[in-house]
Amino acid sequence: MRYVIVSVVKGPAGNFNNNLRKEVFEKLGAKSSKLPAHFTIKAPFEADDISDLDKVLQDFAQNHKAQDYKIKGYNHFDNRVIYMDVHMSKECKILHDELIEELEKLPYIHFKNHDYKDKVFHVTISSKKIQKIYDELWEYVNNIPCEFDCKFDNVSVFKWEDNTWKLYKEYLFM
């Protein structure tokens, strides 16, 4: 089975991202992820049994408090991805890194630079074959203010089923 571990962005920032992704698809044909607004904790991986992951995440969530982060403005990876820029507080970054340390103890979780501790935290707007419309898309989103106070208050595991990501389980911090 294929899984991905994310933190779903909720509240005004999550709604903003979900609506903006729909808007840029309708106006410019820019496609995005099938996941809700999120930042990635662990990129997709394969596993047959994730009962040990379930226990790790339950224990972690029960013993950690939600932390603040900000989303402010936009950024991009070359002309391939446009995203909302995430600015982690010191406490939020520590929470993330402690979570990574727990996850990497599992035998089927292998991190790469792009999803390890020093990843570029971001909430994707569009990432599917946007090179031809990149300039227009970049100009479009930059005319829309983007600034939100957020909480890293959940870890959500999604499972790939029926050609889409479906929520397997959400773990809420204290």
Please name every model-derived segment.
Residues 75-76:
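Long, low-complexity, Ser/Thr/Gly/Pro-rich intrinsically disordered segments that act as flexible linkers
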Residues 157-160:
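Short, exposed beta-strand-loop hairpins at the edges of beta-sheets
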Residues 1-68, 89-148, 166-174:
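Basic, often amphipathic N-terminal segments
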